[in-house]
Amino acid sequence: YPFAEFQDKIEKAKAGQVPPPTPTPLPQGVEFFQPDPGRAGRTYDGSYYLGDANAPIVVLAFEDFKSAETAEHVKSVETKLKTDYIDKGTVRYVVQLFPVVAPRAAVAALCAGQQGNFFEFRNLLLTNLDQWTEGDDAAMQGYAADLKLDEAAFASCLADETVQTQVEQALAFGSSNIGVPQAPSYLIIKVDETGKSQDVRGFPGALPIEQFEQNIRELQAPPTPTPTR
């Protein structure tokens, strides 16, 4: 899936040629990835994020928790992004569910999120990638126990069809509306002071830390002045 095709979809969406429906209706005038002031650490579309709500750069990471590339990214790239950019207020890092292979694991992560442990659960899934199979709710319950979650509430959430629907809608939104070709894929977005997108760059597939850093620097650089005669 070539970069140019992915970027073309993004440019059309920015130009308003693609309608931007989301899994849940948004308040007027906001974008789906903006922080929801009513839910700490969540966006308006319900995704979880790390970092300052007012960071000038937003990274959207489209993830499948059974993806070896995603696991490697979290281990080798995200760690450095967190130290150098997320923790310093430069980047807000949003995990967008794109579970082509493991939708049930995505449901489990959302259930952990209901108890304030989305990232801890997601990291357990990716760290132990070869230790669980998609659809094995017993394994998911085991990870919930490892995190000392309320196991009854977790089990009830796993059986909640609305959470399953949320995951299905997230996958459909990423595929149909954003044009995400695979997991992982990334959008790096420069936002204005209101949190709305000014510039968007799309990258299908894994992205080395050097490319993240280069794009963050370029998006932060002031625009080149237009020469005057």
Question: Could you describe each region identified by the protein language model?
Answer:
Residues 46-47, 95, 129, 200:
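Generic secondary-structure boundary/loop-capping signal
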Residues 51-53:
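Short, flexible hinge/linker loops that cap or flank conserved catalytic cores
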Residues 1, 55, 60-145, 181:
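Structural alpha/beta surface segment adjacent to cysteine/selenocysteine redox centers
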